A protein has these predicted regions:
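N-terminal secretory signal peptides that target proteins for export/translocation
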Residues: 1-15
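Primary mode marks residue(s) on the alpha4-beta5-alpha5 output face of response regulator receiver
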Residues: 41-204
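Bacterial N-terminal signal peptides
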Residues: 21-32
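Sec-dependent signal peptide cleavage junction
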Residues: 34-42
C-alpha cells in the first residue's frame, strides 16, 4: 500500500484533485446520458460484528461491492480521487475523507454497487481505512428527468444546496456506513465514531 504521509504523496494527490475538478466541470458542462435509477433492495443477509449494524442487508450489499476498495490504492486505480479533506462538524461527528469518482458523480445513475464516493478514516499509523460510501447526484441533472428526489435502500437522499462547503453545485446525497458502525444510524450523514484527529492538512 502506498504510504499516506509525505510531501511527495501530497503533491501527487494535489495533481489528481486538480484533474478531477477539471473533469467534473467538463462533465457538468456537456451533460451526461440519463440512466434510470437502479432498484436497491438488499440481496443477502448478515453483517460483521463491530463493522456495521446486524441484520442490515443493504449494508452487506455495499460491503460486497466495495471490499476491493479497502485498499485505497485499488480505489485510486479505479478512478477515485481525494476530494477535500476530513470533513468534520463539531458535536455531530465526522464524514471522513472522501475519494470521489468523477465519472460516476457526473451522471444521473444511482447504483447501490457503484457508489460515487468512498469514505476513509486515517488510522494512527497513517494508513487509510474504508468506513463507508456516499451516493451523489447533482440536483439539476436529477430534477430535469425526475419528479421526486432520489432514494436508495428505502432512504431518502438529503439535498445539499449551493453555495456549500464543498464549492460544487447543489446535489443530493446519501451516506451508508457499511464498514464502521454509526451509533446514530447506518445512513446518517455524521458518524461520531469517525475521527479527524491527526489529519492536519485534510480539513476543508
Amino acid at each position: 500500500m502506498r504510504a499516506w504521509r509525505g510531501e511527495t504523496r501530497w503533491w501527487w494527490l494535489a495533481k489528481r484533485r486538480a484533474g478531477f475538478a477539471l473533469g467534473l466541470a467538463a462533465t457538468l458542462a456537456t451533460g451526461a446520458a440519463v440512466v434510470p435509477v437502479a432498484t436497491a433492495e438488499g440481496t443477502g443477509g448478515g453483517s460483521r460484528r463491530g463493522v456495521a449494524q446486524e441484520g442490515t442487508a443493504p449494508l452487506e450489499q455495499v460491503r460486497v461491492a466495495t471490499r476491493h476498495y479497502r485498499n485505497v490504492d485499488s480505489a485510486i486505480d479505479a478512478g477515485y480521487v481525494q476530494f477535500l479533506g476530513c470533513v468534520h462538524e463539531p458535536l455531530a461527528g465526522s464524514m471522513g475523507i472522501h475519494f470521489v469518482n468523477g465519472t460516476l458523480a457526473g451522471d444521473t445513475t444511482i447504483d447501490p454497487v457503484k457508489p460515487e464516493a468512498l469514505i476513509y478514516e486515517v488510522e494512527p499509523n497513517g494508513q487509510l481505512s474504508l468506513v463507508g460510501v456516499e451516493y451523489i447526484v447533482f440536483q439539476q441533472a436529477w430534477d430535469a428527468v425526475h419528479d421526486q428526489p432520489p432514494s436508495l435502500f428505502d432512504q431518502p437522499f438529503m439535498l445539499v444546496p449551493s453555495p456549500n462547503r464543498y464549492g460544487i453545485p447543489a446535489f443530493y446525497e446519501l451516506h451508508a456506513w457499511a464498514w464502521k458502525v454509526n451509533p446514530t444510524g447506518p445512513f446518517k450523514d455524521w458518524n461520531p465514531k469517525v475521527l479527524c484527529l491527526g489529519t492536519e492538512g485534510h480539513r476543508p
